[in-house]
């Protein structure tokens, strides 16, 4: 194997070879007989040719060096550009290690692998950018609805820059892509929600769903998947406006159906329509009772349904015209019942007799008369609602008066403490009755205050069967006060009577008195033997206004009142609080007045 020689040995061997060749050439020249001048000339040419060869070789070597250096510089520049584009900053790269190399070829050999590797990295990074950019452009087009102007604006802002292929830039693209994916998902869900709402509204209104959504965009009702669902702003706005339009139509139809159904229900009630006939429109009844937003039944607000209900109303109106007189009588009776229950005097201008006479004479249109009665019924219902609290208080007051009457009867029974059947029940009843009776004054005062407050609010008198309630209550308070005075006078008289009897007995001795009857009064509901006392009997509410203070009245639909009868009794004669036989009463009165000769007062 040949060894590479050093420059010194190479120069020595070259000189030796040249000297040998020169000596051989001189020998040839001698043999030829060349002159010295010719020899010098040929030697000069030979030397010149050698110099030219050396110079050419040196130039070639210099050019080769320059090319190698230029290649190295170009590679280094490309590597630097790739590193900057990829965002790679490696302090241990081969470019740092090349400074220790001895030749340009070694330097080139060191950086070329790095260049190839960076080029591969750039190609791979470019593929990632191109793929993400394509997805971004596609989603941007879907969101913008493939609008050229908007699409160019969004894509232009994402123009690919090959000088910036860093991971930071790639992450920005990926973040943008994820943002578009989320926006697409949100828009798609919103479109689906809108479409579902449109489907529900179309079902309720009986409108063709496919035709409705196709007016917004054909892709919303495609069954072939040739085109994806459009999620652009125009589609969302179109669906929003379509929903608003359908809801407006639903409101109009709902109100129309409600009005028509209301008329139908009134006619049903007037005509006493059977439940079987009403069942055909059960769904309509449900709609009227529901709120507009709760209606989801298909075709319930369709034009056909509304027309069917309207046709039914027209049919009943024709039937109503033929039965108008009967309906007027029926509604007038209903009005009188309402007035009786509310203790309000009914309008006499539409009484049964007058209504019948007006209809038979033809002076009044039955429809107008019926409308007038209907208005009066509604007015009575409203007034009865406002009077309800006071009427309830009146009922409680009357119940307390019944308990008071029963307690009076019970206290007059001398056998009330006997151990007979039902005695303990009557004792408990009496205890409850005393508690209730003690509350009567406060009940009356509160009722008066409540009534006056009602009169202030309504600016009219509270009439109870035609008589002002406050006047009734004031009369009751006055009568009750007279009753209390009568009780007090009786107690004083009884005390004086007992005192005189005792004095008489102490002077003249006691004498037997007639034996009293053990019979017990059982009027006004008291039953000494029954376990539960019956309710005091009352008359019905048919009394006239002139009998208000002399005749019992009805104060409720379930009970009859005996209070006004009691008021009259209290106002004409004192109550008999203790049952005293006639003989004892006469003797006692004579004793008190001193009419007997044996009496101390007589003496």
Curated annotation (Swiss-Prot):
Entry's Gene Ontology molecular function annotations? microtubule binding
Question: Where is the PTM Phosphoserine found along the chain?
Answer: 513, 599
> Which residues lie in Polar residues bias regions?
515-526, 537-559
- Cellular component per GO, a single term: spindle pole
* Listed Pfam families: MAP65_ASE1
Highest taxon in the source lineage: Eukaryota
Q: What Gene3D superfamilies does the record tag this protein with?
A: 1.20.58.1520
Question: Where in the cell does this protein reside?
Answer: Nucleus; Cytoplasm; Cytoplasm, Cytoskeleton, Spindle pole
Q: Where is this region: Disordered?
A: 501-559
The principal localisation class reads nucleus
- Which keywords appear in this protein's UniProt record, sorted alphabetically? Coiled coil, Cytoplasm, Cytoskeleton, Microtubule, Nucleus, Phosphoprotein
Query: Which residues make up the annotated site Microtubule binding?
Result: 419, 430
Tell me the Gene Ontology biological-process terms attached to this UniProt entry: microtubule cytoskeleton organization
Entry keyword annotation includes Coiled coil = yes
Q: Which InterPro entries match?
A: MAP65_Ase1_PRC1
PANTHER family linked to this entry: 65-KDA MICROTUBULE-ASSOCIATED PROTEIN 7 (PTHR19321:SF23), PROTEIN REGULATOR OF CYTOKINESIS 1 PRC1-RELATED (PTHR19321)
Q: How does it assemble?
A: Forms dimer. Binds to microtubules (MT).
Q: Which family does it belong to?
A: Belongs to the MAP65/ASE1 family.
The identity of this protein, by name, is 65-kDa microtubule-associated protein 7
Q: Which organism is it from?
A: Arabidopsis thaliana
Which lineage ranks, top first, belong to the organism behind this chain?
Eukaryota, Viridiplantae, Streptophyta, Embryophyta, Tracheophyta
């Amino acid at each position: 194997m040949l060894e590479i020689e050093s420059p010194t040995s190479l120069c020595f061997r070259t000189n030796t070879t040249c000297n040998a060749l020169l000596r051989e050439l001189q020998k040839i020249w001698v043999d030829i007989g060349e002159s010295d001048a010719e020899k010098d000339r040929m030697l000069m040419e030979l030397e010149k040719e050698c110099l030219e060869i050396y110079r050419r070789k040196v130039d070639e070597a210099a050019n080769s060096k320059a090319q190698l250096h230029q290649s190295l510089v170009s590679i280094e520049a490309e590597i630097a550009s790739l590193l900057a584009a990829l965002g790679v900053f490696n302090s241990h790269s081969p470019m740092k290690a090349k400074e220790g190399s001895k030749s340009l070829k070694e330097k080139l050999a060191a950086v070329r692998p790095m260049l190839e590797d960076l080029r591969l990295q750039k190609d791979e990074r470019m593929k990632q950018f191109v793929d993400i950019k394509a997805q971004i452009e596609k989603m941007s087009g879907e969101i913008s609805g493939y609008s050229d102007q908007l699409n160019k604006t969004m894509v232009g802002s994402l123009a690919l820059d090959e000088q910036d292929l860093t991971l930071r830039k790639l992450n920005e693209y990926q973040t943008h892509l994820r943002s578009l994916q989320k926006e697409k998902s949100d828009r798609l869900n919103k479109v689906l929600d809108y479409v579902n709402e449109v489907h529900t509204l179309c079902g309720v209104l009986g409108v063709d769903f496919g035709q409705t959504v196709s007016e917004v965009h054909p892709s919303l009702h495609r069954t072939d998947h040739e085109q994806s669902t459009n999620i652009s702003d125009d589609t969302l706005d179109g669906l929003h406006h379509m929903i608003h339009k359908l809801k407006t139509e639903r409101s109009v139809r709902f109100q129309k159906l409600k009005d028509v159904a209301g008329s139908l229900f009134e006619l049903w009630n007037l005509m006493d329509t059977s439940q079987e006939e009403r069942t055909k429109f059960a769904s309509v009844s449900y709609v009227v009772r529901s709120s507009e937003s709760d209606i989801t039944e298909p075709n319930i607000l369709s034009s056909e349904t509304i027309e069917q209900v309207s046709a039914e109303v027209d049919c009943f109106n024709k039937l109503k015209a033929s039965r108008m007189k009967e309906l007027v009588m029926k509604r007038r009776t209903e009005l009188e019942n309402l007035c009786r229950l509310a203790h309000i005097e009914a309008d006499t201008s539409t009484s049964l007799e007058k209504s019948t006479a007006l209809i038979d004479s033809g002076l009044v249109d039955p429809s107008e008369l019926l409308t007038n009665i209907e208005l009066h019924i509604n007015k009575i219902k409203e007034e009865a609602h406002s009077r309800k609290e006071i009427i309830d208080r009146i009922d409680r007051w009357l119940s307390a008066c019944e308990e008071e009457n029963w307690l009076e009867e019970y206290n007059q029974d001398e056998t009330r403490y006997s151990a007979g059947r039902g005695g303990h029940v009557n004792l408990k009843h009496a205890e409850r009755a005393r508690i209730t009776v003690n509350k009567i004054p406060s009940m009356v005062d509160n009722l008066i205050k409540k009534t006056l407050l009602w009169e202030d609010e309504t600016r009219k008198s509270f009439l109870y069967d035609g008589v002002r309630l406050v006047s009734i209550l004031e009369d009751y308070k006055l009568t009750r006060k007279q009753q209390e005075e009568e009780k007090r006078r009786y107690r004083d008289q009884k005390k004086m009577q007992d005192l005189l009897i005792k004095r008489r007995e102490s002077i003249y001795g006691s004498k037997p008195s007639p034996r009293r009857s053990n019979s017990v009064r059982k009027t006004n509901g008291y039953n000494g033997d029954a376990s539960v006392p019956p309710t005091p009997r009352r008359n019905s509410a048919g009394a006239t206004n002139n009998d208000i203070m002399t005749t019992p009245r009805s104060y409720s639909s379930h009970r009859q009142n005996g209070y006004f009868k009691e008021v009259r009794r209290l106002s004409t004669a004192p109550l008999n609080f203790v049952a005293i036989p006639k003989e004892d009463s006469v003797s006692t009165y004579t004793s008190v007045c001193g009419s007997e000769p044996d009496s101390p007062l007589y003496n």
